[in-house]
Amino acid sequence: MAHKKGTGSTRNGRDSNSQRLGVKRYGGQVVKAGNILVRQRGSKFHAGNNVGVGKDYTLFALVEGMVTFERKGKSRKKVSVYPLAQEANVAVDQA
């Protein structure tokens, strides 16, 4: 029987927290101003109409409206938010 404890491995046992990146609001969803649309590293998605860019490349809505994902040239993707018509806003508020 051993009379000393095993020391175990000191080189393992670390892991980083997940970054929780990705698309947060999908095409066709209605968003409010300030809602985060995409969390990303670098500009995988580019800002389109009514979309702002944070210092960490987070895309967020500048106006209330509907999210659309569009192509910008052959390879670039852009995210835009288009305002809803006034009649549609009234219908959403009453629902």
Curated annotation (Swiss-Prot):
Residue stretches of biased makeup (Polar residues): 7-20
GO cellular component terms given for this protein: cytosolic large ribosomal subunit
MF annotations from Gene Ontology: structural constituent of ribosome
Keywords associated with the record: Ribonucleoprotein, Ribosomal protein
Residue spans crossing the bilayer: none
Span list, region Disordered: 1-24
Keyword Cell division found: no
Keyword set includes Membrane: no
InterPro entries: Ribosomal_bL27, Ribosomal_bL27_CS
Annotated GO biological process: translation
NCBIfam families linked: L27
Family: Belongs to the bacterial ribosomal protein bL27 family.
PANTHER family to which the protein is assigned, alphabetical: LARGE RIBOSOMAL SUBUNIT PROTEIN BL27M, RIBOSOMAL PROTEIN L27
Protein name: Large ribosomal subunit protein bL27
Organism: Trichodesmium erythraeum (strain IMS101)
